Amino acid sequence: MDIESGEVKLILDEDGHCIDVKKRTSGESESMIEEFMLLANQCAAHFARVKQIPFVYRVHEEPNAEKLERLHALLQACGINDHFAKEVPTPKELSAILEGVRGTPYEQIINTGMLRCMSKAVYEEKPKGHYGLVLKDYAHFTSPIRRYPDLAIHRIMTDLLQGTNKETMILRYSDFAEKASKQSSEREIIAMQIERKAEDCYKAEY
């Protein structure tokens, strides 16, 4: 799913003051890097699931009924027919709606509505799939900005690849994977809140 997040790019001068705010765009090279990253993350998660070892997975569950009701109401108000009040849509169906409103006056409001409809992705020690990416296995094995979950699963995979058997891996990392997942999910929320506050301060300065 390709939902426009409305992310902005802040332009700062030499003294760190905000002198411009622009809509963030990504080029072809960045899209290629993202594809490589997604493939690496998917392969790492699949490897861990097949080996049945403790791991830190990135989990994104499907939208809940209450959020789908709100999205349904929004789409109806925009004259778009859907069945989302009765059953969970597939990411392909949501993507088709996004494509249908692209370039229309409804594009921004529909994008925002879909973003709010989505469940919050979290870290968990058990694989539950990634709804938005339509993947059975996913983890944050690599990323442009290094995350603790990346380092946690590097540690686990290094141990396994060095020959540690499955039973020892389970004893050594079951508790670790659970705690790392919980703490990483909690700290991610705090980091996002701080990031948004900082961004708001720069926007206000501009």
Question: Could you say what each language-model-derived stretch is?
Answer:
Residues 1-206:
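Electropositive polyanion-binding surfaces
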